[in-house]
């Protein structure tokens, strides 16, 4: 269900020729048909969320095609022109290097980088936001970047919730409870849901849910009897907060609305939204 202000609406893309119109329409249809409530203050916030999700998906595919390597933190490496490898295996932005340039380099020169899956997901999030922000704004928000697992910049606002419906652009986690300790890096896989039943995970590539589970099961202890599985944990960029920094020159998605109800009372507690 999609709520704009106090109105429950069924949105649709009015310009079928705009970039990624079909993908955006699919996302809108999924959100409108889900039981989960997606609440926005304005139509511009919804437009930002749509563009953000599309850019998360395209950034995931760009990273997949960049040559970016899968490595444990002990074996991680980065381009020393822009980053310093920390003692824990993270990537620390060098002084006087604009974070926008350094993030873009990961996608241009992926073979010069290697790390594990959680860091890759945060890199994708940064790249998606860079596509929607002015470089000056991005560099101000994310100065002194450190890329290391979930130790992301405090100005990157994320929402993690348990339960809810899956939407393209969501980050979800596959867990492998009986992983072989010799390959502990395969205890799970962070992935971006691309839509159409496909996921991107750094290390497994673009695969279906069943294929990712199969890949993780191959890395269990001998005689394991518990299968890997897709958890119900969903992580998203908080598009309502991050939309404040959007570039005014970013094209807005043309969205029309079929009104369903205009007297909804919306209450949000934590990450759970209820409509009365």
From Swiss-Prot:
It comes from Bacillus thuringiensis (strain Al Hakam). It comes from the Bacteria. Belongs to the bacillus TGase family. It holds the Pfam family TGL. GO terms for molecular function: protein-glutamine gamma-glutamyltransferase activity. HAMAP family: Tgl. Keywords: Acyltransferase, Sporulation, Transferase. Probably plays a role in the assembly of the spore coat proteins by catalyzing epsilon-(gamma-glutamyl)lysine cross-links. The gene is tgl. GO terms for biological process: sporulation resulting in formation of a cellular spore. Its EC number is 2.3.2.13. The keyword Transferase applies. This is Protein-glutamine gamma-glutamyltransferase. It catalyses: L-glutaminyl-[protein] + L-lysyl-[protein] = [protein]-L-lysyl-N(6)-5-L-glutamyl-[protein] + NH4(+). It is an enzyme of class 2 (transferase).
């Amino acid at each position: 269900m999609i709520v704009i202000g106090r109105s429950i609406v069924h949105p649709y893309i009015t310009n079928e020729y705009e970039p990624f119109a079909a993908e955006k329409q699919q996302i809108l249809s999924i959100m409108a048909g889900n039981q989960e409530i997606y609440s926005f203050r304005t139509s511009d916030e919804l437009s930002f969320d749509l563009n953000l999700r599309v850019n998360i998906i395209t950034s995931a595919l760009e990273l997949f095609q960049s040559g970016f390597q899968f490595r444990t933190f002990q074996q991680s490496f980065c381009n020393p022109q822009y980053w310093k490898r920390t003692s824990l295996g993270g990537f620390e932005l060098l002084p006087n290097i604009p974070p926008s340039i350094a993030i873009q380099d990961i996608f241009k020169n992926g073979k010069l980088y290697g790390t594990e899956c959680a860091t890759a997901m945060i890199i994708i999030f940064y790249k998606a936001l860079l596509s929607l922000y002015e470089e000056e704004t991005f560099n101000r928000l994310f100065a002194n970047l450190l890329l290391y697992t979930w130790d992301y910049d405090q100005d990157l606002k994320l929402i993690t919730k348990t339960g809810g419906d899956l939407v393209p652009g969501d980050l979800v986690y596959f867990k492998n409870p009986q992983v072989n300790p010799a390959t502990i890096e395969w205890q799970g896989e962070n992935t971006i849901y691309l839509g159409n039943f496909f996921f991107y995970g750094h290390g497994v590539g673009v695969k279906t849910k069943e294929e990712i589970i199969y890949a993780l099961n191959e890395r269990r202890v001998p005689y394991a009897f518990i299968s890997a599985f897709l958890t119900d944990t969903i992580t998203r960029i908080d598009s309502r907060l991050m939309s404040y920094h959007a570039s005014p020159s970013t094209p807005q998605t043309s969205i029309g609305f079929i009104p369903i109800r205009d007297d909804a009372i919306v209450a949000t507690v934590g990450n759970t939204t209820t409509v009365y």
